[in-house]
Curated annotation (Swiss-Prot):
Its EC number is 3.2.2.23, 4.2.99.18. The gene is mutM. Transmembrane segments: none annotated. It holds the Pfam family zf-FPG_IleRS. Keywords: DNA damage, DNA repair, DNA-binding, Glycosidase, Hydrolase, Lyase, Metal-binding, Multifunctional enzyme, Zinc, Zinc-finger. Its cofactor is Zn(2+). It comes from Haemophilus influenzae (strain PittEE). This is Formamidopyrimidine-DNA glycosylase. It catalyses: Hydrolysis of DNA containing ring-opened 7-methylguanine residues, releasing 2,6-diamino-4-hydroxy-5-(N-methyl)formamidopyrimidine; 2'-deoxyribonucleotide-(2'-deoxyribose 5'-phosphate)-2'-deoxyribonucleotide-DNA = a 3'-end 2'-deoxyribonucleotide-(2,3-dehydro-2,3-deoxyribose 5'-phosphate)-DNA + a 5'-end 5'-phospho-2'-deoxyribonucleoside-DNA + H(+).
């Protein structure tokens, strides 16, 4: 599933081809995604794009009339292609621009979404989101306060979008390993010092992943068709039974909150 670094990579890749250009039309070949494609988007024509931003794992395309909200789901990707490009099997949406290019959305599993709103402030999917992990609002004091009374496995806690958005499974695994904290540690047992370490590490891991263009394990591609190269930097994620890069012991895995978790039992003591 594309997480924050992958969505940020997508945003940076598509922005130069969309910002300050005009949408001529939107071609929807498959409207049945996680939620039906908004009717306002299907009928959108001759509207200028004034900005592109991101909130959590949502792409936000700002137009003169409102906002296109895109979510890549489990297997979605966006790319910029010439208007005469051949259509692949899972190319569900084209946003056709007045510069000879189009934004093409491909999604084999169709768990993504393309919606429309005229007001971001009360957009229903944004109302309960936590702070951005790279913002000043996400700090040790915030994490410490938020974790009190939470009898939840720490990795599950870090992946809760009401706590902090966009960390995701890969980056939670990597951050906990670097900090030497077991993924099953209860969130309420975090010390303030551990919160300082976790916050700084999460920010560092996410920034490095963005620089590398995200992580490609299966479906994700950057808008120019290249994979994300952070997969080559992964220390524990997907490395079950391989030697720990710190101690040489064997990396183990378990299921936490229905997600694969990878850790070193020697370097990440439970407690």
């Amino acid at each position: 599933m594309p997480e924050l670094p992958e969505v940020e990579t997508a945003l940076r890749g598509i922005s130069p081809y969309l910002k300050n250009f005009t949408i001529e039309k939107v071609v929807v070949r498959q409207p049945k995604l996680r939620w039906a494609v908004s009717e306002e988007l299907i009928t959108l024509k001759n509207v200028k794009i004034v900005d592109l931003t991101r909130r959590a794992k949502y792409l936000i395309i700002h137009t003169e009339k409102g906002y296109i909200i895109g979510h890549l789901g489990m297997s979605g990707s966006v790319r910029i292609v010439p208007q005469n490009s051949a259509i692949d099997k899972h190319d569900h949406i084209d946003i056709v621009m007045n510069n000879g290019k189009l934004l093409r959305y491909n999604d084999p599993r169709r768990f993504g979404a393309w919606l429309w709103t005229e007001n971001l402030d009360d957009f229903h999917l944004f109302l309960k989101l936590g702070p951005e992990p790279l913002s000043d609002e996400f700090n040790a004091e915030y994490l410490f306060k938020k974790s009190r009374q939470k009898s939840t496995a720490l990795k599950t806690f870090l992946m809760d979008n009401a706590v902090v958005v966009g960390v995701g499974n890969i980056y939670a695994n990597e951050s906990l390993f670097i900090c030497g904290i077991h993924p099953l540690k209860l969130a309420k047992n975090l010390t303030l010092n551990q919160c300082f370490s976790l916050v700084n590490t999460i920010k560092d891991v996410l920034r490095k992943a963005i620089i590398q263009g995200g992580t490609t394990l299966k479906d994700f591609l950057q808008p120019d068709g290249r994979p994300g190269y952070f997969a080559q930097e992964l220390l524990v994620y997907g490395n079950k039974d391989k030697p720990c890069p710190k101690c040489g012991g064997k990396i183990e895995s378990l299921i936490i909150g229905q997600r694969n978790s990878f850790f070193c039992p020697k370097c990440q003591k439970r407690g």
